[in-house]
């Protein structure tokens, strides 16, 4: 008798400005979950926050030219019950079917990027509901989403980070003293965002206020960081079902030669639309530097109390590696660096997502 398949809810879309990236990531996950092992229940969240039963066709979640996918409200409306005695039940909301159990899932893969998904909110819901899920828990997800608290936790562990200033709501701009501690160029970012959305490279102080206003269209709290001269690299961290935590090879992102100052960082279009960046997987680094980065990535994973997975971004400077950010639900598109780094060490995409699901099931929910 064959073993029953594990029912996996893949949740994507969401209310954040990374909605479309989440959809593309989910399409790749759907494409690579082994149908002999898993029964997939796709759940889309619209930009307004409605939950609907999605399509199992991954092509519906692909980038077409420069057109990005999104979740519409055409599917059957549903909700996940927060009652742990009915763990995993998906309840219909549409008239005529309200209250009907559409499915009961064993584990959730929340392929959500940004606010209302990657920031601890859905992780809290899943903990309340008693449903195992892929990725870090509430604390790590919330801390990893907020660049202010990410760096505070990393600094507390003695990990190398760059200098930043936090502009809270109501603080219009930098003081003269803060400007003197930063050095141009600076990067102005939404404090709780990803996919390089809302980021501006500022080469002269006259452009600062416009950059702050641009970032505040995405988040009332803004980060201003000193630019760091160095090579931009990334490292993946993966937890296995037995609790072993490993780091991947290092990947380097290189902007094309001749890019002007306004294009010389890895922004949203460079990541998903323009195909202008060049990548080295693995990065061409001295073995000692690669080993140091991999060790720092695992330490950062531990500092935030992550589980499951993370991607840690670095600059390699003349004085050594500096941690830039940690991403607790990295992109899972076909071109995303996280799956590419693991593929380079023999963990292909299908094995990667299976490992993540198996780790989530082994971990369970609750205090741990």
From Swiss-Prot:
InterPro entries: ATP-grasp, ATP_grasp_subdomain_1, D-Ala_lig_Van_CS, D_ala_D_ala, Dala_Dala_lig_C, Dala_Dala_lig_N, PreATP-grasp_dom_sf. ATP binds at residues 179-234. Keywords: ATP-binding, Cell shape, Cell wall biogenesis/degradation, Cytoplasm, Ligase, Magnesium, Manganese, Metal-binding, Nucleotide-binding, Peptidoglycan synthesis. It catalyses: 2 D-alanine + ATP = D-alanyl-D-alanine + ADP + phosphate + H(+). GO terms for biological process: cell wall organization; peptidoglycan biosynthetic process; regulation of cell shape. Mg(2+) 2 binds at residues 325, 327. One of its GO terms (molecular function) is metal ion binding. Belongs to the D-alanine--D-alanine ligase family. Pfam families: Dala_Dala_lig_C, Dala_Dala_lig_N. The lineage of its organism: Bacteria, Bacillati, Actinomycetota, Actinomycetes, Mycobacteriales. Residues 151-358 form the ATP-grasp domain. Pathway: Cell wall biogenesis; peptidoglycan biosynthesis. This is D-alanine--D-alanine ligase. GO terms for cellular component: cytosol. Mg(2+) 1 binds at residues 313, 325. Cell wall formation. Its cofactor is Mg(2+); Mn(2+). Its EC number is 6.3.2.4. Binds 2 magnesium or manganese ions per subunit. PANTHER family: D-ALANINE--D-ALANINE LIGASE (PTHR23132), D-ALANINE--D-ALANINE LIGASE A (PTHR23132:SF25). Its main location: cytoplasm. It comes from Rhodococcus opacus (strain B4). It is found in: Cytoplasm. The keyword Mitochondrion does not apply. The keyword Ribonucleoprotein does not apply.
């Amino acid at each position: 008798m064959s073993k029953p398949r594990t029912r996996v809810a893949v949740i994507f879309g969401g209310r954040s400005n990374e909605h479309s990236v989440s959809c593309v990531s989910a399409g790749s996950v759907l494409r690579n979950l082994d149908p002999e092992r898993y029964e997939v229940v796709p759940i889309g969240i619209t930009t307004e926050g409605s939950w609907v039963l999605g399509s199992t066709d991954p092509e519906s979640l692909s980038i077409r030219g420069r057109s990005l996918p999104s979740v519409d409200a055409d599917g059957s409306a549903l909700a996940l019950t927060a009652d742990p005695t009915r763990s995993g039940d998906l309840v219909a909301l549409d008239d005529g079917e309200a209250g009907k159990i559409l499915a009961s899932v064993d584990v959730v893969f929340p392929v959500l990027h940004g606010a209302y998904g990657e920031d601890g909110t859905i992780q809290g819901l899943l903990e309340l509901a008693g449903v195992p899920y892929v990725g870090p828990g509430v604390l790590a997800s919330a801390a990893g989403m907020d660049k202010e608290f990410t760096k505070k936790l990393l600094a507390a562990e003695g990990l190398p980070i760059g200098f930043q200033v936090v502009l809270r709501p109501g603080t219009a701009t930098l003081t003269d003293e803060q400007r003197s501690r930063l050095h141009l160029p600076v990067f102005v970012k939404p404090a709780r965002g990803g996919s390089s959305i809302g980021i501006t490279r500022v080469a002269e102080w006259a452009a600062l206020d416009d950059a702050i206003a641009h970032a505040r269209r995405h988040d009332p709290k803004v980060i201003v960081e000193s630019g760091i001269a160095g090579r931009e690299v990334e490292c993946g961290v993966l937890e296995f079902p037995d609790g072993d935590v490993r780091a991947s090879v290092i990947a380097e992102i290189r902007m094309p030669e001749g890019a002007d100052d306004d294009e010389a960082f890895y922004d949203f279009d460079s990541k998903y639309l323009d195909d202008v960046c060049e990548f080295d997987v693995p990065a061409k680094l001295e073995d000692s530097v690669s080993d140091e980065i991999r060790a720092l990535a695992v330490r950062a994973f531990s500092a935030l109390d992550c589980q499951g997975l993370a991607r840690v971004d670095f600059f390699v400077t003349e004085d050594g590696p500096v941690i830039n950010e940690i991403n607790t639900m990295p992109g899972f598109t076909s071109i995303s660096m996280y799956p590419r780094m693991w593929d380079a060490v023999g963990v292909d995409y299908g094995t990667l997502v299976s490992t993540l699901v198996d780790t989530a099931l082994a971990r369970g929910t609750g205090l741990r």
